[in-house]
Amino acid sequence: PAVDAVAACGSLAGRVVVKAIGTAHKTEAGRVAVGLAGASEVGAALDAMDLADDAEVLVEDFVDDAVVELLVSIRREPPVGWLLTLGIGGTLVELLGDTTSLLLPVDAAEVIVALRRLAGWPLIEGHRGKPPADLDALVATILGIAGVVEMRPDLVELECNPVLARPVGAITVDALATVVDLPVRRTPV
């Protein structure tokens, strides 16, 4: 609950991010605060969000070394199959429209070719003095997200945005899943 978030920030070192759970487009809705230092800033951010005391929030370490933010989305497209969409992400994804799509399954080489098709590829390579992204880690993260389709037959769509490509590593910091109820299969005994 939101009332526990202030206490939770004490267990994390450095600055934190506070997000309201279950809200799409958290930035526009005023349901995310980043770079907060200490309990007083977390408390003030929660007050500004005007959440119910029992609202669920997530407190996590603030990642400040992102080379670029990416969109990684998988979506069921009947009758074709699963579509993987990659793009320059974060809050700019709709504005820039810099995306490319592939049909699953894919391998690492296909993911790299797709990333290179993005107009924002130079950002991944390291642009204007920024270090390059850890391409191996980024590709592994993308393939891991794509692999979720095999584990979740109820999944319709999974949008990970942003996935932060870092000089060392990559991390998904927000995701939105759409699932459907599946009929229960009964096996005779």
Model-identified regions with their sequence ranges:
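ATP-dependent carboxylate/acyl-activation modules
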Residues: 1-189
